[in-house]
């Protein structure tokens, strides 16, 4: 009897969902995608990586990434440093790890006095920097494997939600002694959908 009641209840729920499936799916999609900005990295070879960004965890890093991406700063740049089992790094306008946007932003991690709860797990995106804590600019890296030893030292600010196979493919390419791919891994574009939310510009140092 209880089993039949459960089945009947399920059918009623399914019927209700079916009547409003279009509206419900749209609502779920809007809820799922509007909570965080969504970044789309499109590679020259057609590969696509999608990431959600976390402005509550690292607001300056997220503002900076959105500003650079949507101003087409990253278009045509490469992943210049690739270490399989560790990370892939891009965002340098010089293509060799020495370039940036002409300014720096605050390093949002605990060693620099900023609470950041996002651990450097596989798929997490974080800001690359030089030795100085507040030296991040445009360069970023995506963890190819769990790298929690970076926690507290680098500003993690988002995570891959689609396209880890593309990250894996980039991480698997042959590199030279400086970890630069022998064949350029070109970023065609990076764009961030903020779903109408204005995040503003980062504080530039």
Report each predicted region and the residues it spans.
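Cyclophilin-like peptidyl-prolyl cis-trans isomerases
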Residues: 8-9, 13, 18-205
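Positively charged n-region of N-terminal signal peptides that target proteins for export
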Residues: 1-4
């Amino acid at each position: 009897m209880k089993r039949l009641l459960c089945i009947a209840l399920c059918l009623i729920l399914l019927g209700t969902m079916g009547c409003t499936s279009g509206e419900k799916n749209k609502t779920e999609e809007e809820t799922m995608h509007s909570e965080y900005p969504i970044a789309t990295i499109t590679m020259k070879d057609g590969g696509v990586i999608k990431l959600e960004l976390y402005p509550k965890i690292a607001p300056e890093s997220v503002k900076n990434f959105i500003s650079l991406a949507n101003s087409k700063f990253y278009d045509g740049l490469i992943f210049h440093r690739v270490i399989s089992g560790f990370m892939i790094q891009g965002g340098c306008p010089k293509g060799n790890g020495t370039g940036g946007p002409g300014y720096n932003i605050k390093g949002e991690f605990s060693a620099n006095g900023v609470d950041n709860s996002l651990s450097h797990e596989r798929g997490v995106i974080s800001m690359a920097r030089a030795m100085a804590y507040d030296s991040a600019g445009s360069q970023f890296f995506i963890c190819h494997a769990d790298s929690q030893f970076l926690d507290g030292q680098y500003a993690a600010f988002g995570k891959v939600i689609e396209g880890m196979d593309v990250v894996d493919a980039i991480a698997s390419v042959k590199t030279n002694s400086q970890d630069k791919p022998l064949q350029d891994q070109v970023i065609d574009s990076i764009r961030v959908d903020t779903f109408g939310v204005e995040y503003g510009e980062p504080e530039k140092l």
